[in-house]
Curated annotation (Swiss-Prot):
Comment field (misc): Present with 238 molecules/cell in log phase SD medium.
Membrane-spanning parts: 15-32, 68-85, 93-109, 118-133, 150-165, 169-189
Lipid bilayer topology: Multi-pass membrane protein
Residue intervals annotated with topology Cytoplasmic: 1-14, 86-92, 134-149, 190-211
Protein name: Degradation in the endoplasmic reticulum protein 1
Sequence ranges on the Lumenal membrane side: 33-67, 110-117, 166-168
One Pfam family linked to the record: DER1
Family per similarity comment: Belongs to the derlin family.
Coiled-coil residue spans: none
Outcome when changing S59L: In der1-2; impairs the ability to degrade misfolded proteins
Length: 211
């Protein structure tokens, strides 16, 4: 098992690899009760009004207890994020987009408690962002002739959350709205006006310094 995990991690790009390791470590620590599972649950009020900032960090890596289901979820997520990370020419832009998504998510959680951890929500939004940018190249073909966009699957899951689990619109919007905002800033505005609004602060500063 250890050898399999090490081999899988070796094929994952740096940022996604660090996140995957963090998820595995936190999952193990909570299962062993070294970290209290109750203290990894994110709450805007507890973090920003009570000063329990550890919950914010824990929630980014929280994928549940150490079991086969959480392991599969972590490595499926790592596979998606590896594809996205490898599509960026600059790793710092990938990191900056993750930060922007996190800021938007945290702002949304100030209005309503999220249904999932910040790590799960970040993954959902990054997948949405990838589907919006490269969706036409990722179509799934059924019966050898019918092309189906993979974006239909998030729509289905969001519908299940609303009609079956009775989640609020804002809870559901946390799964895709931050990703849509970043996609609009990065792709649509960039194509129309030729401005890259998602450049990292380092790139903005470097461009202003360049004569």
């Amino acid at each position: 098992m250890d050898a399999v995990i090490l081999n899988l991690l070796g094929d994952i790009p740096l940022v996604t690899r660090l996140w995957t390791i963090g998820c595995l470590v936190l999952s193990g620590l909570t299962s062993l009760r070294i970290v209290d599972p109750g203290k990894v649950v994110y709450s805007y009020d507890l973090v920003f009004k009570k000063g329990q900032y550890g919950r914010l960090l824990y929630s980014i890596f929280d994928y549940g207890a150490f079991n086969w289901i959480s392991m599969i979820n972590i490595f499926v997520s790592a596979n998606h994020l590896s594809t996205l990370e490898n599509s960026f020419n600059l790793r710092r832009k990938f990191c900056w987009i993750i930060f922007l998504l996190l800021v938007i998510l945290v702002k949304m959680t100030s209005i309503e408690q999220p249904a999932a951890s910040l790590g799960v929500l970040l993954h959902e939004n990054l997948v949405y962002y990838e589907l919006k940018k490269n969706g036409n190249q990722m179509n799934v073909r059924f019966f050898g002739a019918i092309d189906v966009s993979p974006s239909i699957f998030p729509i289905y899951m969001n519908a299940v959350m609303y009609f079956v689990y009775k989640r609020s619109w804002l809870e559901i919007a946390m799964n895709f709205m931050p990703g849509h905002v970043i996609y609009y800033m990065d792709d649509i505005i960039g194509k129309i006006y030729g401005i890259d609004l998602c450049k990292s602060p380092y790139d903005w500063f470097r461009n202003t310094e360049t004569p």
